[in-house]
A protein has these predicted regions:
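All-alpha prenyltransferase/terpene-synthase fold signal
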Residues: 1-248
């Protein structure tokens, strides 16, 4: 429910019109309805968790919601900052995206009665998985097909978000070519996404980003070594593979 709320709010921020092959809430109604619906879902999720026998879930979800908002605010602040470093980008998506997955893993482990060591390992698993997911998602935003992916694409460029492929490109482009690239990034041309593809290919920016996504996926898988063999463990490993291989 919290995840759905963040997606509704994300679509407002990105001015997206399609999500999961359907019109977004803001496209079908308006931004006001979207903000209120997202807020309602957040509030309702906290109401549900507060009805549990202990306060662990409500504490964890409240803390994660705050961290996610911090990540979103930092991303907004970094728009148009084409000097953003890779470690800063990873820190932002660690809050914006990875925190929610880490929280889900913490909650699942806690309510399953797992030992603290396993809960901590699954927390790290969720974090690494979330970073891998976001990097792969940022690649899809640049190269994916909207009908296949099922959501609005190119919004990162539209909002001048400096994602990992772009950071890699900016780090590798020569000083004499950098002004041309920055002019292209600043343009309002609807075909900017296509115009940038040769740049990404020339400097292996997409392959680098995919490699980093796979690195974080491997880190996630390594955190599962404490878990005994089970269908649940198989599902977590399969989920990790899916995150970096998905095309939608």
């Amino acid at each position: 429910m919290i995840h759905t709320a963040t997606l509704i709010h994300d679509d407002v921020l990105d001015e997206a019109t399609m999500r999961r092959h359907l019109d977004t809430v803001n496209a079908r109604w308006d931004n006001e309805a979207s903000v209120l619906l997202g807020d309602y879902l957040l509030a309702h999720s906290l109401c549900l968790t507060s009805s549990l026998d202990d306060l662990y879930a409500v504490r964890e979800l409240s803390s994660s919601a705050r961290t996610i908002c911090d990540g979103e605010l930092r991303q907004i602040e970094s728009r148009g900052n084409f000097d953003l470093r890779e470690d800063q980008y990873v820190s932002i998506i660690g809050n914006k995206t990875a925190e929610l997955l880490a929280c889900c893993c913490r909650l699942g482990a806690y309510y399953a009665g797992a030992e603290p060591q396993i809960r901590e390992a699954l927390d790290r698993y969720g974090h690494h998985l979330g970073v891998a997911f976001q990097i792969a998602d940022d690649v899809l935003d640049l190269l994916g097909d909207e009908q296949t992916v099922g959501k609005s694409l190119g919004t990162d460029l539209l909002k001048q978000k400096c994602t990992l492929p772009l950071i890699r490109l900016l780090n590798r482009v020569s000083a004499c070519e950098r002004p041309e690239l920055l002019d292209l990034l600043a343009a309002s041309d609807n075909h900017r996404r296509e115009a940038l593809r040769p740049w990404f290919a020339r400097f292996d920016a997409i392959e680098y980003a995919r490699g980093q996504a796979e690195k974080f996926a491997r880190l996630a898988t390594e955190e599962l070594h404490l878990l005994p063999p089970s269908p649940a463990l198989d599902s977590l490993r399969e989920l990790t593979r899916f995150v970096v291989q998905r095309r939608q």
